[in-house]
Structure formats: C-alpha cells, structure tokens
Amino acid sequence: WISAFFILVANSWMQHPVGAEMIDGRPRMTDIGAVLMNPLAWVTFSHVITASIQVAGGFLVGIAWYKLWRRRKDGIDKVVDGKVVVGESDKGARDKKDFQVWLKSLRLGAVVGLIGFAGVGASGHMQAQMMIHEQPMKMAAAEAACHDGTSFSVLTVGELGAQSCDKIHTIIEVPGVLSFLAHDNFNTPVKGIQTLVPEYEAKYGTNLPDNPLYGERAGQKIDYLPSLEVSYWGFRGMIGLGAVVVPFYLYALWVTRKKGVGTVPESKLLKNVAVWSILAPFFAIALGWIFTEMGRQPFVVVPNLEGDPAIRLYTAAAISPGVSGEEILFSLLTLGLLYGVLMVVEVYLLIKYVKAGVVAAMPELVQSHHEDESNDKSKRDVLEFAY
C-alpha cells in the first residue's frame, strides 16, 4: 500500500499539479507537503485500495465456490430436506474441517467483496466530482456529452471514433444522474464538449507552443477532445464490470446463511459464473486506468485550473524524438512477452494450488486415517513454494 501511495501521488500530480512553480521555463517542486497532501492523490488512493479489496474478495468467492461445488459433484456433501449433510472423503483429506474452511472462505470473500465495492463507489463518486471540476473535458468525453445537460447516458450510438458530435446520438439516458455525480443535486447542468472546447482554446491556445520540446509538432492545432470511443466505453466498462458481480456476492451469502441450504448449488452454470467472476474486478481496474490516462489527453500534465496555467505539458512533448518506431515496437514486444510468460506461470501455479486444496496449506488436517496422503510431499508442500 505504501508503494501504491507514492505511485499514485506522482500520477495525481500529473492529473492535478500542486506544490510547484515555473522557474526558467520548467516546473520546480516548492512544497513537498502540498504534493503529498494533494486531495486527488488521497481520493485516488482510496479508490485503488478499495478496488483491490474487491478483487481479493472476488478471488476468494470464486475459489471457495468451486471447492464447495466440487465436494457436491463428487458426492461428498448432499442436501437433504433443504439442509446440507456434510460428508467426508479420504481423498485429499476432504473432511468436515475442509468443508468449514471453504464455507467460511466463501462468506468472508463475499463480505470483503461487498465492502470493497461500497468503498469503490464512495471514492469513485468523490473522484468524479473532482474530475468534473479539474478535468471537465474528461467527463464530457466519458458521457459523449456534446451539449450541456443533467442526464447520464446509458447508451449512445453512432461513430464515436469519428470524434464528431454530428455522428453520435444518445438514445437512452437517465435524467439528473450526471448532475448528481457532479454536484450532488439533480438540476445543475454539466458542461458539454461544444461548450468546453472554446473555453479550453481561449485559456490554453489553439496551437502547440513554438518550443523545441514539441519538435516538428510545434505550431500544430491542438485537439482538446480525448478519444470518445475509449473514454465512453472505458468508463462504462469500469463501472459495469465492478458492479455486475455484486448480486453474485449477495447470492453467495444468501445460499450459505445459517437457516438456508448451507452450501452452493450443484449447478455447473453457477460454478462457471463464480470462477469467471474472478476476472471482472481485474478488468474493471484495467479499464479504469485506461480511461484515466486516455481521458486526460491531449495533456500528459493537466493544468490546475486554480493554479499556474503555465504548469502543463502536452502529450506531444512527451514523445522521445531520439527513439525510433522500431525501438518502441521492440520494447513493447519484449515487455509483452515477459509479462505474458509471467502470466502463464502465475495462472498455472494458481490452478495447481487450488486443486491441491486445504491439505496443501494446512497439513495439520491430515492426521491418522489420512496419514498415507500426508506422506505425499508433492501435495503436502505445494504451498510452501507458493508463498
């Protein structure tokens, strides 16, 4: 968490620069305290941490559901008169303790996932309000909102990739929701693209500065509109994938309640939903970061509307002129290959450990009549390396 905080402090300064002054044409930090206490950094930190908490809860729900489902499929546990009858199996030490471990893990994961989602929603609301104030064009792009209004777009169709308000149409919207996100009321209009573009041009200019930083791009016209396609669908994907698993968490708590069945259904479909739902929060976070970074274009350092407008940097200045396209491609392919290999190894190890089950992590459960299996070191010690 400490590492994440300092990374987010740096990123938040690029989104909302504070504690710096322009000296000899360059921003120089003058107040480290202001940088560390940047309001955006703390809101972003809470948003990221609660999202990671939801990821952890969802992971636990998916694995625990699978293990309980497997016990039912293998005939170890049965449901009689609406109540679970917990059985035992010598294979893998799947006894009553094993059942309790996964049952409690399922319920704990569901609770943690719900707490994480609630935190994500609360911090996300605060972050959205700061974004609308500091980066109004980002929210306008996220809504594909061409005109000032109060409505939240549920579905906008057309050629978002064309970057033209003439080619997009909102067909489903919820009145007042966008105003609530921005101002905590349902009536205050939020500025749209056609209002914001002239404001940005008047404040920051219509062309890139005549500065060596921009190389051949110096003097080119600035497009203050981020990618509508990426911003619009990235914003909805982030929210949708984070929220779609919440009913499943609630259902997991319901079917395992004290007066309920006490275990998961035999449904293979629900088992598949549980396992694949592990990925939803991961992709939600990825889309959230894509939206965050793509939505601030054309800036790499977004100007602080209440600070020195000179402290800003366009993305065109962040391009290294001494690096060729071939070198960039090689770097991307190398990093992609490296992380791809790491992903394959991680997924393989995770599957191996999940299949090994409790007996691998808690060998003390393997006693007496499980003695033969406990001597199988390949199963008993598998989590020693995992940690």
Which residue ranges define each predicted feature?
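Polytopic transmembrane helical bundles with strong interfacial aromatic enrichment
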Residues: 1-387
